Structure formats: C-alpha cells, structure tokens
Amino acid sequence: MQGTLSVWLAKRGLIHRSLGFDYQGIETLQIKPEDWHAIAVILYVYGYNYLRLQCAYDVAPGGLLASVYHLTRIEYGVNQAEEVCIKVFTQRSNPRIPSVFWVWKSTDFQERESYDMLGITYDSHPRLKRILMPESWMGWPLRKDYIAPNFYEIQDAY
C-alpha cells in the first residue's frame, strides 16, 4: 500500500520503493543512495523542513547497512504534522551515502555518530570524523561482525 508521499513522488518520476507504514502509521520509503540527495532537496522544498532523527543500523552480519531519516513537515496552523521515514541502504564493503547536512543542518552530529559506529561515509559532510570513539580506534563497534578487542584502556579522571 502506497502512502500520499509515495504517490506524489511516483507522479513526478522519482524512483523509490514504498515499505508500507510503521506501527504509528508513518509512511516508510526506501531510496537508493545515488538518488538520496536530490530527493532530500525535493522533500525539503515540499515542506519537510525538520529532520527529527537520523540513525543507522546493521541489517545483518555480512549484509547491508542502513541510514534512517525521520522527517517532519511542520506548518503554521496545522495541528498534526506529517511525518515520513526514509531508509537508504548501502553495501558494507564501501558504505557511501550522500550527506544531507546542507539540507538539514541538524544531521551534523547524527551522521558523524553513524560514521563513527558503523563506518558509513557521508559524502560532502564538512566534518566527518569520529565523535564518540578515539581517532585511533580500529573498526566499527556497532557492526554485527565487529570483534571487540581483548583490552580496554581505562584512564583516570584526575
């Protein structure tokens, strides 16, 4: 079943895949990485002016990585804001997704965290570097195939 946004995108020839609705009735769409930046700009112009959340997850060991965006359309005088969930899947061997930092500035630290934990490179992000782990850390801790090191260095707070 397609939602209103999926129908609107299809009428304009924008390639996507409808993933149905989540348990709260929020429409979920899948966008290819190469189409994501253009569709993000279109969604912003269409009225999705607030990026509520960006996160990423490992679909399965050896499988795809996903970057998830929850967008909200906030309008003056409208009590119930429209929401949409966008999922962009990428290969784990060279995980690259266009950054939407220049569309929604609030994605800055969220994309950096996804890079730090899963190794997804967000192309054209102005400050893509580790944010939680030390720069010297090897690997991506939230990947399902990550092997934790046998040691952890604990530093005094003094």
Swiss-Prot record:
Coiled coil start-end: none
Domain of life, source organism: Eukaryota
GO biological process assignments: photosynthesis, light reaction
GO CC annotation: chloroplast thylakoid membrane
Subcellular location(s) of the protein: Plastid, Chloroplast thylakoid membrane
Catalysed conversion reaction: a plastoquinone + NADH + (n+1) H(+)(in) = a plastoquinol + NAD(+) + n H(+)(out); a plastoquinone + NADPH + (n+1) H(+)(in) = a plastoquinol + NADP(+) + n H(+)(out)
EC numbers on record: 7.1.1.-
Residues annotated as transmembrane: none
EC class (word): translocase
Any one GO MF annotation of this record: NADH dehydrogenase (ubiquinone) activity
Primary site of residence: plastid
InterPro entries given in the database record: NADH_DH_suC (IPR010218), NADH_quin_OxRdtase_su_C/D-like (IPR037232), NADH_UbQ_OxRdtase_30kDa_su (IPR001268), NADH_UbQ_OxRdtase_CS (IPR020396)
Keywords for the protein's UniProt record, in alphabetical order: Chloroplast, Membrane, NAD, NADP, Plastid, Plastoquinone, Quinone, Thylakoid, Translocase, Transport
Membrane topology listed for this record: Peripheral membrane protein
Annotated family: Belongs to the complex I 30 kDa subunit family.
Function statement: NDH shuttles electrons from NAD(P)H:plastoquinone, via FMN and iron-sulfur (Fe-S) centers, to quinones in the photosynthetic chain and possibly in a chloroplast respiratory chain. The immediate electron acceptor for the enzyme in this species is believed to be plastoquinone. Couples the redox reaction to proton translocation, and thus conserves the redox energy in a proton gradient.
Subunit annotation: NDH is composed of at least 16 different subunits, 5 of which are encoded in the nucleus.
Protein name: NAD(P)H-quinone oxidoreductase subunit J, chloroplastic
Gene name of the encoded protein: ndhJ
